[in-house]
Every structure is written in structure tokens, then in C-alpha cells.
């Protein structure tokens, strides 16, 4: 985000200096008929020009406090800072992984709540950085409108999800039917109300700055809400499409750190001086192997491979189905050189294992660029971490900067190469039609199946 500077030797707000008169402006006020817009532009230039300044002009965000538990500090007090950070990161990583396994055990609904909670926290961390940088300018309604827009965008995206995956539940509730039927109009009306509130909150001194912060909020919404929505869409395709990509990113993060910590010598990128080629390459091979094994293990269980569906008869999410061909063992011919090494011509694999190679490759080669992007953002504001939520790790956004990029790739991958027509969704749409429309579809479908020879023609006597 760009920062304020002052033109023409005019000191900041509250300073004693005055700007030089503009061309054609008399000292005695002979040009009182000059347009108000020109005067407002001059004020905007004095107080809101955010361009053409060096990094030294960026105000430093107050440093985050250390939240490492005291008992952990005392236990590691004799170690160097390098090894102290190693142990803190390691202990907290194992703790988070254990909690993640617990949430997986609790089911897909808890995973959805976890994704929403992470989304809100990431949004709060990014918005807080903007507020800390510009809090001295007392922007009216900035934080209130930011959270209002978050609610509006969430309503827009997740209203669509409710309509798609909870159709049977919605049909039983009159109030929900109204919200779903007019969902897009309600979403637009809510956003329009926030837009009008923003326009009404504009203040002369801060026009340009307020528009910068308006853009800040919307870019933050684009990063957090849309990506978390894609994560939940992936989860509905089957928990395996959620777990393998996320765990691949986590594996790459851990193994790249380990390889870099012990073997790192060659810097990888200037944005992150601690990143090394050794860590990057070691993380790549480790992640591909991990993803391949994880795909094999998870493909065995319906709990992970079946699409998540809401069943109205049991009033809960279920993961029961006949696994698709993607999750059924198939024989594949080995290349000649592997046949010589393994002394066999074929190998049994789940087709999803082959897809996992693409997912793991993206997680290890492209995913880290999400982290590099976040590093550049933090360098721009002279901060080490987005927050201090997790000792040794920083904020929640520091842990999920690569996950958001991964979520988009997985969603595009599924829609491009995997997803076909969903019979349950088609049936849900048919059930909400009028009886006459349903009969017309039935007759058309019957004629179509008869012409294809699937149904025997019925002869009228």
C-alpha cells in the first residue's frame, strides 16, 4: 500500500507552512469564482498523493508481541536463537497437525467451519495491517465497512452453495426458499447499501486514501473469500480432494524447511533470503512421494473418496457411495526400464494416484510462489509476520498463503479433467419444477431412451 507525502514544501496536516499559490490565483481572492472541484483537487493533492516516494516513507507497522508460552521459553532458554526457533516451530507444527487430524475425524461439516474460521482470521490480519498503517488518519467507517463487505461477499458465495447442496433441506423451510430464490438480488442489494455507505463516508482530506483502502478491502476479499469458497467446493467433491492438496502443501513447507535448515547453501529468491535451492528441490521430491502414498492410503476408504452430500432423512452430511473408477485399482503397464528393475510388467494403482502427482507437483513448484508473494507484501510494510497468532509461525495468513493458490488450482483441475454431470444435482433441480414441467421432461426422456433401445417401446391396443 502506498503512503502519504506532501508537495511543495507543505508540512503535514497540522504544520505551519502554506502551499504556494497556483498560477492565476491572486492573494486577495480575486478568483473566488474558481470551481470548487479545483480546490478539492488541490486538497487531495496535498493530503492524498500516494505516489512517487521511497521505501523510507512507508510507516512501520508496530511489531507483534511474542506469544511463546513461558514454559516453552524456559525450557529452551539455553539454546541459540536458531535452534530455539527450530523447536518452537516443530512443537507447534505437531500440535496443529494433531488438531487437524481431530477435526478430520469429526467430519466434513467441522472442516467447513474450520475453513470459514481461517477465512475470517486471514481477512482480519490483512485488514489490520491496513488499519495500523493508516489509523492516525482516522478514516471514517473503514473497519466497519470492511467487515460489512465480508458478510455480503460470504452471503453471495455461500448462498449459492446452500442452493446447490442443501436443496432438500431448503424445500422444507419457507423462509430459506425466499432467501435462495432471490439470493442474487439480495446479495446485490446488500453490496449496494455498503457501496452507498462508503460514498457517504468520503471526507475531503482523505478522498484518495479512502479509495485506496476501498481497493485494499476488495482485494483482500478476493484473496480470502473466493479462495475459501473454492476450498469448500473441493471438499464437496470428496474429502480426498481437500486433504491431499492441503497436506501436500504442508508436507512441502515442512520438508523444504528441513532440507534448507540442514543442507541449505544456495539462496533461492531475494524476497525470502532464508529460502534455498536445496530446500526447494528436497521439498519437491518429498512432496511428490508423500502425495503418491497419501493418495494410495486415502483411496481405500469411502469416507474420503465419496462426495459429501446432505441427507434430509438423517439430517446430516453423509459420505456413502459406490466409489468411481478414479478410486478403483487398475493395472498399468510399466515402462521397459522399470520392468527390468522390478521384474514385473504391470503395477496396480488407483487412477487418483496419477492425479496426485500433478497436485503434488503444483504444491511444490508453484505453490511456494504464494509464499513469495506474501513475503513481498510483508517487506513492503516492513513487517516480519501478518500477526503473532502462532508462536514461531506468525499469523494464520503466514501458514495459508500457499494454500489459497493451491485451492484455485485444484478447483480448476477438477472442473477441467475430473468432474462430470452430477445426477443428484440434476434430480434436485427436477424436484423443484412444476408437475407439468416434470411430466414433459419424463416424456422427452422416455422417448429418447426408447429411440436408443434402452427402453422397450410400449404398444397401444
From Swiss-Prot:
Cofactor annotation: Mg(2+)
Compartments in which it is found: Endoplasmic reticulum membrane
Entry EC no(s): 2.7.7.41
Modified positions (Phosphoserine) in chain numbering: 35, 37
Segments crossing the lipid bilayer: 96-116, 149-169, 183-203, 230-250, 279-299, 357-377
Feature: compositional bias, Basic and acidic residues: 22-56
Region (Disordered), start-end ranges: 1-68
GO biological process: CDP-diacylglycerol biosynthetic process; lipid droplet formation; phosphatidylinositol biosynthetic process; positive regulation of fat cell differentiation
Catalytic activity: a 1,2-diacyl-sn-glycero-3-phosphate + CTP + H(+) = a CDP-1,2-diacyl-sn-glycerol + diphosphate; 1-octadecanoyl-2-(5Z,8Z,11Z,14Z-eicosatetraenoyl)-sn-glycero-3-phosphate + CTP + H(+) = 1-octadecanoyl-2-(5Z,8Z,11Z,14Z-eicosatetraenoyl)-sn-glycero-3-cytidine-5'-diphosphate + diphosphate; 1-octadecanoyl-2-(9Z,12Z-octadecadienoyl)-sn-glycero-3-phosphate + CTP + H(+) = 1-octadecanoyl-2-(9Z,12Z-octadecadienoyl)-sn-glycero-3-cytidine-5'-diphosphate + diphosphate; 1-hexadecanoyl-2-(5Z,8Z,11Z,14Z-eicosatetraenoyl)-sn-glycero-3-phosphate + CTP + H(+) = 1-hexadecanoyl-2-(5Z,8Z,11Z,14Z-eicosatetraenoyl)-sn-glycero-3-cytidine-5'-diphosphate + diphosphate
Record carries keyword Magnesium: yes
Membrane topology: Multi-pass membrane protein
Pathway assigned in UniProt: Phospholipid metabolism; CDP-diacylglycerol biosynthesis; CDP-diacylglycerol from sn-glycerol 3-phosphate: step 3/3
Modified residues (Omega-N-methylarginine): 7
Family per record: Belongs to the CDS family.
Stated name of the protein: Phosphatidate cytidylyltransferase 1
Native source species: Rattus norvegicus
Gene coding for it: Cds1
Amino acid at each position: 500500500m502506498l503512503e502519504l507525502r506532501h508537495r511543495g514544501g507543505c508540512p503535514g496536516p497540522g504544520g505551519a507552512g502554506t502551499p504556494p499559490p497556483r498560477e492565476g490565483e491572486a492573494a486577495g481572492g480575486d478568483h473566488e469564482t474558481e470551481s470548487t472541484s479545483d480546490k478539492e483537487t488541490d486538497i487531495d493533492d496535498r493530503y492524498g498523493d500516494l505516489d512517487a516516494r521511497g521505501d523510507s516513507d512507508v510507516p512501520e507497522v508496530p511489531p507483534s508481541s511474542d506469544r511463546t508460552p513461558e514454559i516453552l521459553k524456559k525450557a529452551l532458554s539455553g539454546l541459540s536463537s536458531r535452534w530455539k526457533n527450530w523447536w518452537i516451530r516443530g512443537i507447534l507444527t505437531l500440535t496443529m497437525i494433531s488438531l487437524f487430524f481431530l477435526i478430520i475425524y469429526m467430519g466434513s461439516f467441522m472442516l467447513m467451519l474450520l475453513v470459514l474460521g481461517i477465512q475470517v482470521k486471514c481477512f482480519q490480519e490483512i485488514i489490520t495491517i491496513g488499519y495500523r498503517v493508516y489509523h492516525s488518519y482516522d478514516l471514517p467507517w473503514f473497519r466497519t465497512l470492511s467487515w460489512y463487505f465480508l458478510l455480503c461477499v460470504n452471503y453471495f458465495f455461500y448462498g449459492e452453495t446452500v442452493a446447490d447442496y442443501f436443496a432438500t433441506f431448503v424445500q422444507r423451510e419457507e423462509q430459506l426458499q425466499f432467501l435462495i430464490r432471490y439470493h442474487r438480488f439480495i446479495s446485490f442489494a446488500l453490496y449496494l447499501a455498503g457501496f452507498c455507505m462508503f460514498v457517504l463516508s468520503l471526507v475531503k482530506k482523505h478522498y484518495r486514501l479512502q479509495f485506496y483502502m476501498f481497493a485494499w478491502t476488495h482485494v483482500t476479499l478476493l484473496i480470502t473469500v473466493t479462495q475459501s469458497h473454492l476450498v469448500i467446493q473441493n471438499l464437496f467433491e470428496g474429502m480426498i480432494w481437500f486433504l491431499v492438496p492441503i497436506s501436500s502443501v504442508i508436507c512441502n513447507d515442512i520438508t523444504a524447511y528441513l532440507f534448507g535448515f540442514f543442507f541449505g547453501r544456495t539462496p533461492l529468491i531475494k524476497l525470502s533470503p532464508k529460502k534455498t535451492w536445496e530446500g526447494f528441490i528436497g521439498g519437491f521430491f518429498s512432496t511428490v512421494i508423500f502425495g503418491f502414498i497419501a493418495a494410495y492410503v486415502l483411496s481405500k476408504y469411502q469416507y474420503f473418496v465419496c462426495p459429501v452430500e446432505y441427507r434430509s432423512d438423517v439430517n446430516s452430511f453423509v459420505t456413502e457411495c459406490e466409489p468411481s473408477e478414479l478410486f478403483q485399482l487398475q493395472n498399468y503397464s510399466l515402462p521397459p526400464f522399470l520392468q527390468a528393475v522390478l521384474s514385473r510388467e504391470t503395477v496396480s494403482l488407483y487412477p487418483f494416484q496419477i492425479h496426485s502427482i500433478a497436485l503434488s507437483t503444483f504444491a511444490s513448484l508453484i505453490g511456494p510462489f504464494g509464499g513469495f508473494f506474501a513475503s513481498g507484501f510483508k517487506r513492503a510494510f516492513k513487517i516480519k509476520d501478518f500477526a503473532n497468532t502462532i508462536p514461531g509461525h506468525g499469523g494464520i495468513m503466514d501458514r495459508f498463503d500457499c494454500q489459497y493458490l493451491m485451492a484455485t488450482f485444484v478447483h480448476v483441475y477438477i472442473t477441467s479433467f475430473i468432474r462430470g454431470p452430477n445426477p443428484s444435482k440434476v434430480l434436485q433441480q427436477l424436484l423443484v419444477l412444476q408437475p407439468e414441467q416434470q411430466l414433459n421432461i419424463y416424456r422427452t426422456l422416455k422417448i429418447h431412451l426408447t429411440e436408443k433401445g434402452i427402453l422397450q417401446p410400449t404398444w397401444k391396443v
